[in-house]
């Protein structure tokens, strides 16, 4: 391996281990290859450099509040949270096509709540850079109720480099996962996804993620919302509708 340069990812490290494995077996040193070297390679395959993965998860209302303040600070829109849904989507799509950041790196003039959320996302980007893409594979949006709820965290992830804007559509290593929780949201979930997938920019992102859309359904909140029977019926209907729309 190149002297003094760190491995970019676990597969690069394993490629060097494979060379050692081949050399040992060619020298009839299978005992060594099958012992410690095999154990190291198994650990790399299982844990990479990150040991275990962490999901990002936040409530949709929090994302809206953060973006409202960020957009106002960046003079993009003074009151994002008052926009109609279609206008929100139009603005978010435009931002996902724009490579430039909304605020200068290191800017810390936000409210405490907004700064805390931005710091968390920035730290996630540092962790991915240090330990690899497997470190943080998912962004979960709890209480997802609209297309804009799903696009908002993507704009924030773009702000820290976890999603990149380019001419072919945004790219990134994080799966965007809406969590539909209340009975109303379970019933609306399939329709929300249809509208989301009709957006070329989101379809492009989904395509580079293997054309797989993961969705989460909330069991506890739907039970609290409508009771056991109504919640389970809504969950069954939601699962059926989501399979059909997929």
Annotate each language-model stretch with its function.
Residues 56-60, 138-146, 175-183, 231:
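Conserved short loop/turn motifs at secondary-structure junctions
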Residues 122, 126-137, 144-163, 168-174:
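Secondary-structure-rich domain cores
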Residues 127, 152-165, 177, 181-246:
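Active-site capping/gating regions of soluble enzymes
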Residues 8, 12-15, 19, 32-35, ...:
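Generic recognition of stable, solvent-exposed alpha-helical segments in well-folded globular domains
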Residues 70-86, 160-167, 171-173, 197-206:
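Acidic, His- and aromatic-enriched active-site or binding-groove loops in soluble protein domains
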Residues 52-55, 61-64, 149-151, 187-189, ...:
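Short helix/loop capping segments that flank catalytic or ligand/cofactor-binding pockets
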Residues 1-130:
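Extended, charge-enriched "interface" segments that sit outside catalytic cores
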Residues 41-42, 49-53, 134-140, 173-177, ...:
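Beta-sheet entry/capping signal
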């Amino acid at each position: 391996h190149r002297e003094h340069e760190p491995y970019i990812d676990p597969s690069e490290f394993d490629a060097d281990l494979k060379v050692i494995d081949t050399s040992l077996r060619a020298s009839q040193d299978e005992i060594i290859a099958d012992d410690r070297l095999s154990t190291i390679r198994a650990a790399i395959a299982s844990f990479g450099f990150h040991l275990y993965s962490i999901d990002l998860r936040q409530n949709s209302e929090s994302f809206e509040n953060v973006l409202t303040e960020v957009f106002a600070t960046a003079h993009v829109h003074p009151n994002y949270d008052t926009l109609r849904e279609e206008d929100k989507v139009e603005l978010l799509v435009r931002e996902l096509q724009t490579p430039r950041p909304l605020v200068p790196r290191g800017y810390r003039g936000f409210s405490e709540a907004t700064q805390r959320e931005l710091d968390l996302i920035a730290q996630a980007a540092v962790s991915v850079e240090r330990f690899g893409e497997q470190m943080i594979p998912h962004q979960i949006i709890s209480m997802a109720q609209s297309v804009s709820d799903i696009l908002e965290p993507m704009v924030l992830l773009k702000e820290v480099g976890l999603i990149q804007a380019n001419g072919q559509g945004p790219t990134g290593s994080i799966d965007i996962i809406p969590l539909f929780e209340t009975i109303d949201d379970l019933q609306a979930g399939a329709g929300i996804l249809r509208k989301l997938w009709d957006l070329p920019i989101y379809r492009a992102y989904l395509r580079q993620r293997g054309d797989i859309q993961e969705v989460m359904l909330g069991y506890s909140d739907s039970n609290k919302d409508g009771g056991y029977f109504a919640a389970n019926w809504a969950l069954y209907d939601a699962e059926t509708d989501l399979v059909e729309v997929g």
